[in-house]
Amino acid sequence: MKEPKLKTVYVCSNCGETSPRWMGRCPSCGSWNTMNEDVVAEAPKAGLSGSKAAAPARQEGVTSLTARRLADISTTEEKSRILTGISELDRVLGGGIVLGGVVLLSGEPGVGKSTMLLQLCGAISNQHSVLYITGEESVRQVKLRAARLKVPQENIYLAAENDVDEICGLIEKEKPELVVIDSIQTMRCMDLSSSAGTVSQVKESAARLLAVAKKQEIPMFIVGHVNKDGAIAGPKVMEHIVDTVHYFEGDKMLPYRILRAAKNRYGSTNELGMFDMTGQGLEEIENPSQMLLEGRPLGVSGNCVACTMEGSRPILSEIQALATKTNFPAPRRACSGYDYNRMNLLIAVLEKRAGYFFGNLDVYINIVGGIALRDTACDLAVCLCMVSSLLDCPVSDKLIAIGEVGLGGEVRSVPNLEQRLREAERIGFERAVVPKHSLAHLNPADYPGMKLIGAAYISDAIHALKSDRL
């Protein structure tokens, strides 16, 4: 049989668009510097002598494919999910690992992806068999890491392999109850001439692994590397075909890690899991609010506590603001962990509706602990931080502010206010500034240790704080 000819093409790592020549910008998605060189086999020409003519004609009504009635398919939770025993991971997964589900776990190098998955294997290996495929380490290296983490090793099977077809054959032979692939960028389909990590290899490897996971109904975790922009390296189609995409985030200079879901077909994408990186591996942080507020400076202006909702979990976070005289023709505005445009909007509201001017001041906003706040319920706390820094008037360490601020200066209601207040009371806060019209829906008896202060407008909240000499 005549071997197919090879040709060089350039493939966009973002959308998969191909081009016979290199271009700085992808003509399909418009991304810059995403066209990567790849080697593919030329497709045979269509026609009388091409593949279409050589393919046998399909007989009408003849197929080996069967369909199952929807009512006959079991959907009970105890049969369709596996609990990992790691509550933070189960929370982000939506209640455990779904049978046949494929999870793509991505993160910066050294953030702890392999550590988490090895601990996951140990957590479920008491009741389920696990197959761990490593393409980056030897089995001895994984063994040393498992010993350091004190992972149960009896029911975990290791294999160091890069050939995807060999891995699929091993999965079909052993039929494990969980498979871990570390990582997809090291996998290779031997019938493709390109090297491992290229767009075609990553795309085809992911498709073949997904096919065997669905066919055997085996849950699978796949590790994916990130590029210099923080996005998952490889074609975007890989994120589309998997069931769940998780990002493992964290500053390597800080001990804790955050697990987020960017996509989840079987649960919410708003949930968040927090872990502490220790010498014995990752440990769950069951009380993130208390951890994030540890070491909070007291009696310092520009600090206030807000409560954000991450899925069904309320988390208290410290917001810091600094307003200082500028040395530049145009004052600087900078944010860390907060939306820049939202900050400018709130500054405009404070100037127009409350009479506090920041036109000749540099303004900086920082969310302590590296948490990214996207919840508009933090608006009121951000405004109080900026005013506190402007007036050099500290906010009480026993006060929390919850509310969305509108363009008219009004303080609007927020969802899950009761849960936020209960969390604040549990941590020890004694006063809460909340939207005034939300007081009608709250029972003060439910919060015996907390005084609720209603504010209809941002000026009311600031006046209440100043009159209370905070």
What positions do the PLM features span?
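Peripheral, non-AAA+ core regions of ATP-driven protein-machinery
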Residues: 4-14, 18-91, 98-106, 111-122, ...
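Conserved RecA-like ASCE P-loop NTPase motor core of nucleic-acid helicases/translocases
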Residues: 130-134
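Conserved Walker A/P-loop ATP-binding site and its immediately adjacent core
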Residues: 135-141
